[in-house]
Regions:
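Short conserved loop adjoining the S-adenosyl-L-methionine
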Residues: 154-160
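Conserved SAM-binding loop of SAM-dependent methyltransferases across substrates and taxa
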Residues: 108-120
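Conserved SAM-binding loop
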Residues: 135-136
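Conserved class I S-adenosyl-L-methionine
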Residues: 97-107
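S-adenosyl-L-methionine
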Residues: 1-99
Length: 281
């Protein structure tokens, strides 16, 4: 959804209209749009509201019932961390006893929501105005969370009282996936350098990242959700109680909710070394 469509929804009329819509039903979308225009709403506002209604329906797979109170863009939703995964991220910060987390490259605020949901004060930062606006809306239920539209690397973390960081560098440009970590925005090396100021650092990275790009003194964990490998994350300092190495977090959905198990690679304490390839039997 274009930025001007997001702006339309942030007006009193736009928010009221969006809040009045029923759950998305593709068989009713055309007739609903026609009815809303006949009521006097502008075509642009109707299009924005119906697009958001459809995005919320898609977002339920990642955010469950919380999606109905959030705002999304198509790109933001695609890149957002699933709530089941971000909850595990947030648990690391809570267990480490940190007092304020900076979510750098927060996007629509998915990870910041999980952190704030554990009563952790959060400073969410994104340089994209539309993303920052959506994160502001999505974090409204949490008075201990704030959002800034700024370059993540220009934030003075010490001055802001931040003692932990979660970073999600942009890994796409013009719709194309970027595989070189030094071409991410910001570059992986720039993000890892934040450890000199804030040792408690977590970085979301692509699951297919070259092992040579992983810091040898950190713990890297790959995450699988219902059989799909969705991400990897680098955990540093107090956020890595396992110590240097690598592991896999496996999440499975079922009738009793989500179950989790962790598999640790016992063969190495250096995640920058590629896994041993076993000969086929």
């Amino acid at each position: 959804m274009a930025e001007n469509h997001v702006a339309l929804l942030l007006t009193p009329e736009g928010w009221k209209l969006l809040s009045s819509l029923p759950p998305y039903d593709p068989s009713e979308a055309l007739s609903l749009g026609r009815s809303l225009r006949e009521e006097g709403h502008s075509p642009a506002l109707v299009a924005a509201a119906l697009t958001q209604q459809r995005l919320r329906e898609r977002a339920a797979a990642k955010f469950g019932p919380f999606a109905q109170q959030m705002l999304f863009t198509a790109d933001g939703l695609e890149q957002a961390t699933r709530l089941t995964v971000s909850a595990h991220h947030a648990a690391r910060y809570a267990a480490a006893g940190v007092t304020k987390v900076a979510d750098l490259g927060c996007g629509i605020g998915g990870d910041a929501v999980a952190l704030a949901g554990l009563d952790l004060p959060v400073l969410a930062v994104d340089r994209d105005e539309a993303a920052a606006a959506l994160a502001t809306i999505n974090l409204m239920p949490f008075p201990h969370a704030s959002v800034e539209c700024a370059d993540a690397l220009e934030i003075d973390l010490v001055e802001r009282g931040v003692d932990a960081v979660f970073a999600d560098p942009a890994r796409r440009a013009e719709g194309r996936r970027i595989t070189d970590p030094e071409q991410w925005s910001p570059a992986l090396s720039q993000v890892l350098a934040l450890r000199e100021t804030v040792p408690a650092l977590g970085v979301k990275v692509a699951p297919g990242i070259d092992h040579a790009a992983l810091p040898a003194d950190a713990h890297t964990q790959w995450v699988s959700v219902d059989g799909d490998v969705v991400e990897a994350a680098i955990w540093c300092g107090p956020l890595a109680p396992e110590g240097p190495g690598r592991s896999a977090l496996i999440l499975r959905s079922g009738a009793q909710g989500t179950t989790a198990c962790t598999l640790v690679d016992p063969s190495t304490t250096d995640p920058s070394q590629p896994p041993i390839q076993l000969d086929p039997i």
